[in-house]
Amino acid sequence: MKGKLSIALMLSVCFSASATDSVHWGYEGNGDPAHWGKLSPDFSLCETGKNQSPINIRQALNAQHDPLQLAFQSGTQQIINNGHTIQVNVSPGNTLLLDNETFTLQQFHFHAPSENEIDGKQFPLEGHFVYKNADGALTVIALMFQEGAANPQLATAWQQIPARVDQAEDVRTPVAIQALLPTSLNYYRFSGSLTTPPCSEGIRWLVLDHPVTASAEQISQFSSVMHHANNRPIQPLNGRIIIH
């Protein structure tokens, strides 16, 4: 299992990076989000795309959509600071059933402050759980954190952040993914994109409407490791429908 996870890590260390290692991009200076679309032809959607993420979630349509069907399985994890985020890669076994398709969790990572907003409210931290189906299509479950009580699962992750950038470490005490999520799994749904280059579209976004808590110290610790904000600015909705 460890070998399989290591191979997966090498092939796709981060959907945030998305095979963009040869082109420097980031959140500051000439590599910041305003410049992404011009850094490489592969990044053109960052500038020209019409279904980009993140968005400000507002005026959502109330609709009957299926409850989240999640399954969790304990397994091995690896944690890495890739310079853009703190990411936890997970072994197979955690699944999402959506639109009669099975998606498998690949990794989860964080942005501070939040990328998506809900009715104009920005949260201090947002987690993205990246799922992939057999055809390679992606679904992202987004989880908001509000300042409050310390989060035990974040504490588990933060204690194991590697000292060096791009250094992957086996997680000695795995993060309990189910325990990281709220008890209520109501969500907003819309079509969007990766929030990092190459900004690929066609991503199914499910943004949970109930935040969980993280302490001010935990939020500050993440920001200190990143040394800068790592959120892409809000993108135009361009007539997209949001359902809730």
Swiss-Prot record:
Task: Give the matching Pfam families.
Answer: Carb_anhydrase (PF00194)
- Give the matching InterPro entries: Alpha_CA_prokaryot-like, CA_dom, CA_dom_sf, Carbonic_anhydrase_a-class, Carbonic_anhydrase_a-class_CS
Family annotation (SMART domains): Carb_anhydrase (SM01057)
In this protein, which residues make up the domain named Alpha-carbonic anhydrase?
Answer: 23-244
Source taxon at top rank? Bacteria
Q: Which GO terms describe its cellular component?
A: periplasmic space
UniProt xrefs under PROSITE patterns: ALPHA_CA_1 (PS00162), ALPHA_CA_2 (PS51144)
Chain segments annotated as coiled-coil in the UniProt record: none
Q: Where is the signal peptide?
A: 1-19
For activity, the cofactor(s) needed are: Zn(2+)
Q: Which GO terms describe its molecular function?
A: carbonate dehydratase activity; zinc ion binding
The entry's family comment says: Belongs to the alpha-carbonic anhydrase family.
**UniProt-recorded name of the protein:** Carbonic anhydrase
